[in-house]
Amino acid sequence: MFISPLLKWYVKHGIRVTKICQVVEYTPVQCFRKLGEQISDTRRAGDTDPNKTILGETNKLTGNSMHGTTATNKEKHRKIAFCNENNVSRCVKDPFFRQCNQLNDTTFEVEMSKKTITLDLPLHIACFVYQYANLCMLEFYYDLMDTFIDRRDFQYCCMDTDSAYMGLSADSLEEVIKPELKHRYQSEKHNWFPRSDAPEHASYDKRTPGLFREEYRGDGIVALCSKAYYCFGVEDKFSCKGINKRLNNINTNTYMDVLLTKRSGNGTNRGLRSVDSTVCAYLQERAGFSYCYSKRKVSTASLDI
């Protein structure tokens, strides 16, 4: 399913729609505009007043997390029960039984489907949010980068929902703008990046949704897959979703070994978990450095130096 703004962009850039299965008509209303403005204003206040920093960070968390819940697939929810040998056979015969794992000689973990599932989440909210994010990233690449910069002067390394890591043939983006398009770029720059003519404008636009800003600058990057990359330079920056950064010795070689050997790497997680009225310590080995990247077409050359 495509939202109409994204579909219009696809058609404008040459994609031909040959079949339409269903159309859902709606009346566009900016129902969350006040909430978005409130979050942006609170974050701006947190930038200028140290006493309001915690409010800015709290609103950042709210803005980044509130739409994700609406995309939850409740049909995949399961009920987990722990039982002994005497009760496991009764659970297996239950029509809602899905699978059983033996934890030790006397304890079994049984997974059951829920008897009733209430599908009451507004899925269209998550659909619009994520597809608008997709539209912003497409516009940034094709309408800005690919228009104003020669493809020999930049190369995308990895991309996420709201960020893109790329290599440039110069020290800054302005230096690789096509000479014949520099005047046009300066006149349209404010549509993509925060204004730089005055400090107060830059501070205000820093928290304006839809504008891009430089998040990191370094010497290189090892990008394995989504949320698994290592940037190195004056100050290193890395991401390893699902792996505890404090418990594992993570450096450039951790990612390079996966890239060169084509074998996923593991990490260790340790912590406490509450089960019923008991607190248990756990030690988990997890494959957090994956080599496989199936979401996008990747370059045949693993290394580009």
Which residue stretches match the model-derived regions?
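Conserved acidic
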Residues: 1-305
